[in-house]
């Protein structure tokens, strides 16, 4: 009987509602931890792994030797490579695709590459308008690498002690 009376007074005085309002009021004046993303940005780590890029040697020749280690080590199976032999007997890629919907940005491809061909850049913000645009092909990867080569080389040199 006492339980029913207590419950009646609690519901009559709306104690649960007042408790919720007090909690809201208490957190209203505390500092906010939310970052308003497009206007404010988090500081990026020097080892941040973002959009991929293929690098070239200083003479302009692409670094990838089509060893397919990155394709083999990729846990998400996001990398597809086709290769062909050239006239001089070396192998080069004819197709190098990365499906960014599958990629988990683990960095294994970058670690396994013996010639530092595939790297992950600092680029975080990219979008796709259509479904097929999520597959980044070899010319696109080379263009990203050409555009950011100075920055990539600088970041690799700064991180060389930890590799």
Curated annotation (Swiss-Prot):
One Gene Ontology biological process: aerobic respiration
Cofactor (UniProt): [4Fe-4S] cluster
Domain 4Fe-4S ferredoxin-type, residue spans: 54-84, 94-123
Subcellular location as annotated: Cell inner membrane
Binding site for [4Fe-4S] cluster 1: 64, 67, 70, 113
Keyword tags: 4Fe-4S, Cell inner membrane, Cell membrane, Iron, Iron-sulfur, Membrane, Metal-binding, NAD, Quinone, Repeat, Translocase, Ubiquinone
Cofactor binding annotation: Binds 2 [4Fe-4S] clusters per subunit.
InterPro entries: 4Fe4S_Fe-S-bd, 4Fe4S_Fe_S_CS, NADH_quinone_OxRdtase_chainI
SUPFAM superfamilies reported in the protein's UniProt record: 4Fe-4S ferredoxins
Gene Ontology MF, one: NADH:ubiquinone reductase (non-electrogenic) activity
Pfam families cross-referenced by the UniProt entry: Fer4_7
Topology versus the membrane: Peripheral membrane protein
GO cellular component: plasma membrane; respiratory chain complex I
Gene3D superfamilies in the record: 3.30.70.3270
Record-stated family: Belongs to the complex I 23 kDa subunit family.
Its biological purpose: NDH-1 shuttles electrons from NADH, via FMN and iron-sulfur (Fe-S) centers, to quinones in the respiratory chain. The immediate electron acceptor for the enzyme in this species is believed to be ubiquinone. Couples the redox reaction to proton translocation (for every two electrons transferred, four hydrogen ions are translocated across the cytoplasmic membrane), and thus conserves the redox energy in a proton gradient.
Subunit structure: NDH-1 is composed of 14 different subunits. Subunits NuoA, H, J, K, L, M, N constitute the membrane sector of the complex.
PANTHER family found in the cross-reference section: NADH DEHYDROGENASE [UBIQUINONE] IRON-SULFUR PROTEIN 8, MITOCHONDRIAL, NADH DEHYDROGENASE UBIQUINONE IRON-SULFUR PROTEIN 8, MITOCHONDRIAL
UniProt-recorded name of the protein: NADH-quinone oxidoreductase subunit I
């Amino acid at each position: 009987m006492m339980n029913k009376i207590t419950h009646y007074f609690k519901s009559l005085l709306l104690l649960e509602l007042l408790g919720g309002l007090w909690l809201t009021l208490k957190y209203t004046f505390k500092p906010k931890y939310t970052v308003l993303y497009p206007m404010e940005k988090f500081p990026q780590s020097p080892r941040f792994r973002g959009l991929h890029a293929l690098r070239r040697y200083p003479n302009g020749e692409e670094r990838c030797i089509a060893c397919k280690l990155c394709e083999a080590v990729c846990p998400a199976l996001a990398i597809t490579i086709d290769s062909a032999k050239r006239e001089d007997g070396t192998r080069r890629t004819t197709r190098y695709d990365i499906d960014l919907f599958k990629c988990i940005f683990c960095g294994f491809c970058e670690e396994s590459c013996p010639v530092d061909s595939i790297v992950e850049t600092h680029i975080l913000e990219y979008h796709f308008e259509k479904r097929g645009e999520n597959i980044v092909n070899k010319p696109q990867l080379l263009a990203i690498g050409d555009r950011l080569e100075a920055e990539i080389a600088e970041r690799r040199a700064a991180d060389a002690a930890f590799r």
